[in-house]
Amino acid sequence: MAIQTRFASGTSLSDLKPKPSATSISIPMQNVMNKPVTEQDSLFHICANIRKRLEVLPQLKPFLQLAYQSSEVLSERQSLLLSQKQHQELLKSNGANRDSSDLAPTLRSSSISTATSLMSMEGISYTNSNPSATPNMEDTLLTFSMGILPITMDCDPVTQLSQLFQQGAPLCILFNSVKPQFKLPVIASDDLKVCKKSIYDFILGCKKHFAFNDEELFTISDVFANSTSQLVKVLEVVETLMNSSPTIFPSKSKTQQIMNAENQHRHQPQQSSKKHNEYVKIIKEFVATERKYVHDLEILDKYRQQLLDSNLITSEELYMLFPNLGDAIDFQRRFLISLEINALVEPSKQRIGALFMHSKHFFKLYEPWSIGQNAAIEFLSSTLHKMRVDESQRFIINNKLELQSFLYKPVQRLCRYPLLVKELLAESSDDNNTKELEAALDISKNIARSINENQRRTENHQVVKKLYGRVVNWKGYRISKFGELLYFDKVFISTTNSSSEPEREFEVYLFEKIIILFSEVVTKKSASSLILKKKSSTSASISASNITDNNGSPHHSYHKRHSNSSSSNNIHLSSSSAAAIIHSSTNSSDNNSNNSSSSSLFKLSANEPKLDLRGRIMIMNLNQIIPQNNRSLNITWESIKEQGNFLLKFKNEETRDNWSSCLQQLIHDLKNEQFKARHHSSTSTTSSTAKSSSMMSPTTTMNTPNHHNSRQTHDSMASFSSSHMKRVSDVLPKRRTTSSSFESEIKSISENFKNSIPESSILFRISYNNNSNNTSSSEIFTLLVEKVWNFDDLIMAINSKISNTHNNNISPITKIKYQDEDGDFVVLGSDEDWNVAKEMLAENNEKFLNIRLY
């Protein structure tokens, strides 16, 4: 009798159960979401049930025994490889350099010699790798379970069935029991070709005598694949054949009842403590929720396949919505299999910790989920509601909100693991089990922390895009040079805890290299502004810290007058810093490119208030980060000219602590980099000196080792001191050493000459490269300007000076830049920029300004 059955193109465990009718497929989504999941939905119990049903065939018993033995060996080898991997990771973390062959791994039994030999089973060879070689995590995945099995478990039923089917002959025996009138040849052999020939005969027999088509059948490759999805295809066909002969094979339900009775007899309830009972309850909850999670992933996989088959969405868009879904399902099925096995043994014999140790590398599969989750949700909101679905197309998920809930499942599950492991640890009474659970807790916390960090980074990326459009004038800074955005919040800032000093609220953004302060733009400017006092300066402003550019050049910030503000002592950003410079918003060409490339960014922030850029504090010059009792951080900073402190007051202590730990880590990392740089410089200098000395006078070096050591120590200390002085001098204006640079062409102005400049004037030292001269060198000349002049007056004076010098034979001036105190040339293109330059000169008691014309 031919069995007419049809399998879904997307393989899942639920396909092993009776197929739903057409009306049941279109049930509301909440029924799919809330559908109860039992042990019959678990691959572990499905395989155990099939194995039990196959045992009724006496001809299969020797093949089942052989499959059991090969699965046991694979489990031992997996245990050995995992122990090697963990041992070598420990050696690497401790900085050791010993051969890993010295390790003594903890295995489930003593059959290491069997596992480390060359084996040939059912035509498949397993060759042990070099013990000293570090195995990849993919190479440690030899069975369909993760980690190390409990000592009372030799193998899992899933791996055993996989090894059974790879022998080929058992499939032919199954076929002959169902269709005895069309018997297939049964050849027991360890020759791989013979095994594949038997599998091929089985597939042809199913096509011819059971009316299977190619889509409903599996391939020879599926039988030998190390994949749960491909194994499920084989299980579907095997179970269909068994269900076609109820007189030979007992039903699934009856078999399950027999198995439950055997388990109850094997694990008769004993007198146990309350702690033990609580532990067992937590394990049951762990397994039940994991079954539900795997089932939800399979629902998503079916929905993904339906979308692909309907041509409503591209494969690229599908990957954005369901990244690594197939790999995640395969991993989580194996994870669940291991949980099911551990749940069958006593808590003292469980290896939950080993499960997490093996799985921690595979949890990285979820990185695309955490990174692209927000993008997927946005895509659903903007795209799926536009798609028209025919009445004939009935999706297993037909509600956008419920689909979003399914997409959140992976991240939610990963964040749930630490809570479950923590509960197990609290109820654990075995010392060995406790140690492994502690390791599992650390791993699960790191996983959840990594997921949250990825989501935070993704969200911060969107915040930076919005910030770019919200700021009215970036005053010459380039946001791409700030590093990654770490935190942002609305924070109150002051210089003391005194209630007499007013606090001012700013939007503060913490980047890797800089802290930026913003205030919201209002229609009426407030008359009062925040003043951050300095300890060693009479100026009522906050000096910015230092940050080095790619060449190690220092940068020091200063005050800048607030846009459209006439007389306020506001905190302002420097318009300099090569490592944190942004093209000036006054540059028309830059503005045009920015506007064209970021129109979407402005749309993102259309409903949010615009921001004024008010101040910056460089991470490089932060000294101390001290949490205060009133939800505040006391931040001290120091430069070569001045030092100071300010308070950031947050809304709650948790936010303060996050900022505090982040800032302290940034300072710590920066100091480590500086130490490594100094150490590298010292080592290079010492090595060079020693090598030179050895080449010049090898005899002296050999005969006077004390002198050599003394010189080496001196050189090292001198190099360290020199590096330290260089770091301290980072706040000074840098000097260009290139012969063609502007700085090398101009002469320093003496103090007498500087004092001769009137207080109301500023001396411009102008460098101008006139292209009409067909020369690459710059011409240098000076111009005395008045402080009361506006920007237009400056342009007229400069043009007049150049015209008189070159008899009107000049190229048009397209851009003007001035040199700030950091040594960087910043655009001078408006009255505001001119005011900033004058403030810089006044703050540094300078009367001359270097200018470049373009």
UniProtKB/Swiss-Prot annotation:
InterPro entries: Cdc24/Scd1_N, Cdc24/Scd1_PH_dom, CDC42_GEF, CH_dom, CH_dom_sf, DBL_dom_sf, DH_dom, GDS_CDC24_CS. Residues 135-246 form the Calponin-homology (CH) domain. It comes from the Eukaryota. Residues 478-668 form the PH domain. Residues 278-454 form the DH domain. Keywords: Guanine-nucleotide releasing factor. Residues 1-24, 542-571, 674-745 are annotated as: Disordered. Residues 682-707 have a biased composition (Low complexity). GO terms for biological process: cellular bud site selection; chemotropism; establishment of cell polarity; intracellular signal transduction; pheromone-dependent signal transduction involved in conjugation with cellular fusion; protein localization to cell cortex; regulation of exit from mitosis; regulation of pheromone-dependent signal transduction involved in conjugation with cellular fusion. SUPFAM superfamilies: CAD & PB1 domains, DBL homology domain (DH-domain), PH domain-like. GO terms for cellular component: Cdc24p-Far1p-Gbetagamma complex; cell cortex; cellular bud neck; cellular bud tip; cytoplasm; division septum; incipient cellular bud site; mating projection tip. Residues 761-854 form the PB1 domain. GO terms for molecular function: guanyl-nucleotide exchange factor activity. Residues 1-14 have a biased composition (Polar residues). Interacts with AXL2. Present with 1010 molecules/cell in log phase SD medium. Promotes the exchange of CDC42-bound GDP by GTP. Controls the polarity of calmodulin, and the calcium regulatory process of bud emergence. CDC24 may be involved in the initial selection and organization of the budding site. This is Cell division control protein 24. It comes from Saccharomyces cerevisiae (strain ATCC 204508 / S288c).
